Swiss-Prot record:
GO terms for cellular component: cytoplasm. Conjugation of reduced glutathione to a wide number of exogenous and endogenous hydrophobic electrophiles. May be involved in detoxification. It comes from Drosophila melanogaster (Fruit fly). GO terms for molecular function: glutathione transferase activity. Homodimer. One of its GO terms (biological process) is response to toxic substance. This is Glutathione S-transferase D6. It comes from the Eukaryota. Belongs to the GST superfamily. Delta family. Keywords: Detoxification, Transferase. It is an enzyme of class 2 (transferase). InterPro entries: Glutathione-S-Trfase_C-like, Glutathione-S-Trfase_C_sf, Glutathione_S-Trfase, Glutathione_S-Trfase_N, GST_C, Thioredoxin-like_sf. The gene is GstD6. It catalyses: RX + glutathione = an S-substituted glutathione + a halide anion + H(+).
Amino acid sequence: MDLYNMSGSPSTRAVMMTAKAVGVEFNSIQVNTFVGEQLEPWFVKINPQHTIPTLVDNLFVIWETRAIVVYLVEQYGKDDSLYPKDPQKQALINQRLYFDMGTLYDGIAKYFFPLLRTGKPGTQENLEKLNAAFDLLNNFLDGQDYVAGNQLSVADIVILATVSTTEMVDFDLKKFPNVDRWYKNAQKVTPGWDENLARIQSAKKFLAENLIEKL
């Protein structure tokens, strides 16, 4: 099973932790988006949308992080605990996954990812939208240990990958006490956390080295 990815990206880290949870190993193939490798003909042939991560499982090809993690748990999970078959539980998990994609991850991407290109974060408006996204997550977690229901799910894993991106930058989660509490617990109960943290540290080192060149 091949995973075309960029190691430190939140999307890749979400897939890697999910794979760890279901006991799947990948042949990891790095695609450097900073130099445009995702646009090379060989990769566009695999994924016309030229996005990473992209999973190739025999002749089956799937991309988009949240689609990949759901596929992995449904295809390889030993049970349905990470993505229950109950329609209402599944719907809640889906809602949290869509919230991550359209609001939380989007907020982090628009505020922090410009650092990779310019050495400076996004605008004050971007920061306000990011704080609003964390306020929503903080609300979701009021009185709960997990983001969707009463047990660890793929929604926790994906959102953990997103939130842990703040380890690379100066962002205080203590402003959001429910998120901070959940984040500390999620590190303890999520398979693959240590590997996730190692990838973050490598990405942080890369970021620091490149920031020095840009400043």
